[in-house]
Amino acid sequence: MILSEIFKTQLDPKVSYLHEPFERRYSLNLDLSEIFKPLIVDRVIFTLINKEMIKPEHFDQELNFCYLNDSGRKIFIQEFDRKLNSTLKYPKLERKVSYRYMLRLECYKLIKNFLEKKPYDSFKIYW
């Protein structure tokens, strides 16, 4: 999902700030995920737990590990997709944008950093 937004811009997904590039991994994808994990993924998890959408029967336990089973993954992906398509007011644009589009806006800020040599100011949760 982040990678698809990177590909819609002029950025090279192999060039990053935080993560070491590897042969079979796009490190910029990982850098941007660090910014948005708490905002998107963690909130989806808390929603699923607080609304009791995910229950113990949605997990499989093997050895000392616990995994979402197929029905649990389906619930998670549906809620994750709903979150990506929901909107919030983006401070600099002063209008609502989807969380998905917000990822692309972050890519544009990186491009601006490269081209205009302006300091990069990553997205911050503002509530």
Identify the role of each PLM range.
Residues M1-W127:
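Active-site helix-to-loop segments that bind/position phosphate- or nucleotide-bearing substrates
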